[in-house]
């Protein structure tokens, strides 16, 4: 369903975690965008639309996921970015890296310390930066940023410093 499948997960304590995931031959959307920029070209709009549409299917799948009892899991990816959209050699785009995703009816911004944000700043929704309650709209904001960047061939909010990036958003 346009999401890279995780087959096995193991917590190895201090050594970290081990994930066995679906192998996707291809590259991430960020790499495709960089390659287009380095050759002074843009990804054709119809190709961009296909990739974004496929990635959006994966996001929708995650957002609609339910538990065994049928209750919504309310999954929020929180790190939707070109680097987390894998474009396979088979032409299918898949969403990857749910490492900081949250599944609960009250999705709060998780922090590991004061002012420690999770996710890539240039793709964060304003409510994510503020530490407000999050829902699927947070991920849709990030997807919108990706759409703009793919079609325009340049970054939307990225600035010279993190503070300047936050100000632009």
Locate each region found by the language model.
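Conserved ATP-binding/catalytic core of the eukaryotic-like protein kinase fold
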Residues: 1-169
């Amino acid at each position: 369903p346009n999401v890279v499948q995780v087959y096995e997960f193991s917590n190895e304590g201090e050594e970290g975690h081990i994930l066995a995931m679906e192998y996707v031959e291809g590259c991430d959307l960020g790499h495709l965008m960089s390659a287009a920029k380095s050759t002074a070209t843009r990804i054709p709009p119809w190709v961009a639309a296909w990739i974004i549409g496929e990635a959006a299917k994966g996001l929708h799948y995650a957002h609609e996921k339910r538990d065994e009892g049928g209750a919504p899991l309310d999954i929020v990816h929180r790190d939707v970015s070109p680097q987390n959209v894998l474009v396979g050699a088979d032409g299918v785009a898949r969403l990857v890296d749910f490492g900081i995703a949250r599944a609960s009816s009250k999705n709060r911004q998780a922090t590991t310390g004061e002012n420690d944000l999770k996710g890539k700043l240039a793709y964060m929704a304003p409510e994510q930066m503020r530490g407000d309650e999050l829902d699927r709209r947070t991920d849709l904001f990030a997807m919108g940023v990706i759409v703009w960047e793919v079609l325009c061939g340049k970054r939307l909010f990225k600035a010279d410093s993190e503070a300047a990036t936050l100000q632009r958003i």
